[in-house]
């Protein structure tokens, strides 16, 4: 037990604040996060390569998939998860869902992709194309290549179901509140490192497939089979690590380790949810609080802006890479860079910036970064549209390659600041609120507003595509929407910063007053104890 009370050295306390007795819990949890993140990153690059390259719609299919594919898919899988959770044990639910995902990816690579031409709805697509306007070709491609669309949806659901729901459900259940403050920062670092690992492995497999599969129908199929084999192997490790953690989640083992008296993160959430039914409406509370509305605007703005930028960037990349193998290699390198920048920013910049210059400066980093990198990206696109060869000629590359490269830089930094500055300042913004506002407001914002932002961006694109027929033709309208969203984001953060400062100062004054009262009570109690210990003086 001495190790538990012994303080860490300054170096270890900063980089690895884990006690030796916690290794049996932390190490499998860390590697579980790592391998779940590896599969997430591999699937992210693979789904884009499969769906975007080779079709006549390119990146225009993304907005339609987000609304008509991912949203219904998320609802269906969430219903399945809820149904299973009510009838089966936690372990059965985890293994069944993860096994279901792995089984689908293996089935797709070995059976569905090779016979895809026979499965695709070419006649229906031709009929839809004759009915819909030119801007609806993204919807037509989504329906025509339904098997690719299904792979895209399942890959996206790995993030929301396996990573967000299953993994963090395990982490919250097994981790105490005291441990979470030390565990979760390192786990997030593990997720960033998994992006680096997955990006480099995917890049290498694209250039040098490890196994030459005789059943491969084309070069991309061979790469897909190798990546799928890695996904299945990582899935096997995930299931093995979960079984180790499942034994630790048993209440008797937690008692033996002295953790029974301490509330876990999952138990804490359960305690908070007991009062949740008393709230008439999450959104009524949200609408009554200008402060919570400000946080909602910030979350909505980020999800809207990142989606608008991403579709334009991927549209540029699709024009350069006609091969799925080449496109996958490019996206793999972007994944690697995102992981590196996220890890370095999280370790060396985000926390120090907020501690030194305050919440407002930290919260302004995401919109300003996206504004600056986005201006460079869109400026290059407008230069290409105007046949300007200035920067491309100086750098010795074509203007189209330059725009794609700048779009990649914009995406890397946008994703990196999301995992560091944005998430941290968003969570900090809830701290000075009352418990009801904090719990109910956070549930509404994280559970609904973030999804509204993503779907809202897709709906904006669908409307623009119907009107202007293509992403390139919609660029002026997209620029206006982006400027309005970024301007609103920055304005709201400036206002929120003043409110946050006022609320935290008021909270600090309350805490100081309470501490003063407690100190006075302790001093009075000490004085009474001292007087009671004095022996009476008697005289003869």
Curated annotation (Swiss-Prot):
Location(s), subcellular: Cell membrane
Predominant cellular place of this UniProt entry's protein: membrane
Topology with respect to the bilayer: Multi-pass membrane protein
Keyword Transmembrane: yes
Residue stretches spanning the membrane: 23-43, 61-81, 93-113, 150-170, 185-205, 222-242, 292-312, 334-354, 361-381, 389-409, 455-475, 477-497
UniProt GO MF annotations: ATP binding; ATP:ADP antiporter activity
One of the record's GO cellular component terms: plasma membrane
Keyword set, alphabetical order: ATP-binding, Cell membrane, Membrane, Nucleotide-binding, Transmembrane, Transmembrane helix, Transport
Record carries keyword Transmembrane helix: yes
NCBIfam families listed in its UniProt record: AAA (TIGR00769)
Family that this chain belongs to: Belongs to the ADP/ATP translocase tlc family.
Protein name: ADP,ATP carrier protein 2
Organism taxonomic ancestry: Bacteria, Pseudomonadati, Chlamydiota, Chlamydiia, Chlamydiales
Gene name of the record: tlcB
